[in-house]
């Protein structure tokens, strides 16, 4: 609240600084995510925060979803707050290293802009189509911008005469990992072509990825506004916001009739559908865990949709909280082993 009363709308040439728009967004998110037992969860107050942002007239959706992830297009009119990076150490962010394919690294080296080490990979639910049991609908343009499905690369590494050719990798060079998902769809949003040897910029190293990381986008604000309207009994208006703005852009400006949400849907139906829409719009941007926690779907949907959680069977209710770090317990006089969150070793 203090930030909303004191921060400016802009710092002009200092985009790394949080503005009042970002403060209103975070306050609205706090009202929505507050545990119900605290009495602080308040959709009306949250919606006032989001309407304040909308009425500022400062932010709008980009026409093309793909433009959000261009390395040469940071801090757009859709951005309320971005973490700033560049390709020069120590200001690079290693996202490519985390999200890229180890198979591509083994085949093409670290100068391929989608090489990496598979530390962050999407679940099958997040990359499959609805027909395959996943999230993506036919014609949704966000799918190909969010995820890499094709790992074919233009290289001279495997030609006898040094000519460039298109090479599609397989798993033959990564059998030592004992896994088989190195060429399953990967996160594409943070690939930075500047690091690619083919860019001609001389970086040639996936470690130096430097795209900004978007923390709060106007699309997020609109979806939260719609969610609040639904909770406040204005489901039809909420549907129109999602149809006319979020989904229309996702289909390139012309939303087919069969992709329009029914304005007569129930409040419960909208709750479920808007969570899936948030996944399509904001996947890999850091909000999914909080969304699942605040809607009390964390354990249920991870068990249902997360391949690795299914296989391990480890996800439990106590995982809603992180453990208190052992170093904090040992060095902070205010904590003792008995203060560890339930479910974790004391």
Model-identified regions with their sequence ranges:
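Short amphipathic alpha-helical segments and their helix-coil junctions
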Residues: 1-11, 197-204
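A glycine-biased, small/acidic residue-tolerant capping/turn segment at secondary-structure junctions
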Residues: 255-259, 287-294
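Short, solvent-exposed loop/turn and secondary-structure capping segments
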Residues: 36, 40-43, 91-95, 156-158, ...
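Elongated scaffold/linker segments in the mid-to-C-terminal portions of large proteins
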Residues: 52-55, 59-222, 229-231, 298-346
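Helix-capping and short linker residues that terminate individual alpha-solenoid repeat units
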Residues: 4-9, 57-60, 250-252
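A glycine-rich, coil/turn loop motif that links secondary-structure elements
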Residues: 11-23, 68, 262-264
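Extended, hydrophobic/aromatic-rich amphipathic alpha-helical segments that build helical scaffolds
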Residues: 1-7, 15-54, 81, 140, ...
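Short, mixed-charge amphipathic alpha-helical segments
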Residues: 259-270
């Amino acid at each position: 609240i203090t930030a909303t009363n004191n921060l400016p709308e802009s710092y002009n040439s200092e985009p790394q600084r949080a503005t009042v728009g970002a403060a209103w967004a975070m306050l609205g998110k706090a009202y929505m995510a507050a545990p119900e037992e605290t009495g602080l969860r308040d959709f009306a107050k949250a919606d006032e925060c989001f309407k304040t942002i909308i009425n500022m007239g400062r932010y709008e959706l980009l026409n093309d979803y793909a433009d959000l992830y261009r390395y040469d297009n940071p801090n757009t009119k859709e951005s309320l707050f971005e973490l700033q990076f560049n390709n020069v150490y120590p200001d690079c962010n290693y996202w490519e290293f985390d999200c890229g394919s180890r198979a591509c690294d083994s085949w093409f080296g670290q100068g391929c802009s989608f090489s990496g080490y598979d530390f962050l990979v999407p679940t099958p639910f997040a990359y499959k189509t609805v027909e395959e049991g996943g999230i993506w609908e036919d014609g949704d343009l966000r799918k190909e911008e969010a995820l890499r499905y094709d790992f074919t690369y233009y290289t001279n590494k495997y030609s006898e005469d040094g000519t460039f050719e298109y090479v599609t990798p397989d798993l033959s060079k990564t059998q030592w990992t004992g896994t088989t998902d190195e060429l399953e769809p990967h996160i594409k949003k943070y690939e930075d072509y500047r690091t690619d040897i083919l860019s001609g910029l001389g970086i040639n190293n996936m470690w130096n990825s430097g795209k900004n990381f978007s923390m709060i986008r106007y699309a997020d604000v609109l979806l939260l506004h719609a969610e609040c309207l639904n909770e406040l009994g204005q489901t039809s208006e909420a549907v129109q916001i999602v149809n006319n703005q979020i989904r229309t852009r996702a289909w390139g400006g012309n939303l087919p009739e069969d992709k329009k949400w029914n304005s007569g849907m129930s409040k419960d139906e909208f709750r479920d559908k808007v969570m899936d829409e948030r996944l399509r719009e904001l996947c890999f941007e850091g909000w999914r865990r909080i969304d699942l926690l605040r809607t009390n779907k964390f354990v249920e949907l991870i068990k249902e949709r997360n391949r690795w959680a299914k296989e391990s069977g480890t996800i439990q209710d106590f995982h809603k909280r992180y453990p208190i770090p052992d170093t904090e317990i040992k060095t902070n006089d205010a904590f003792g082993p008995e203060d560890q969150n339930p479910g974790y070793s004391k």
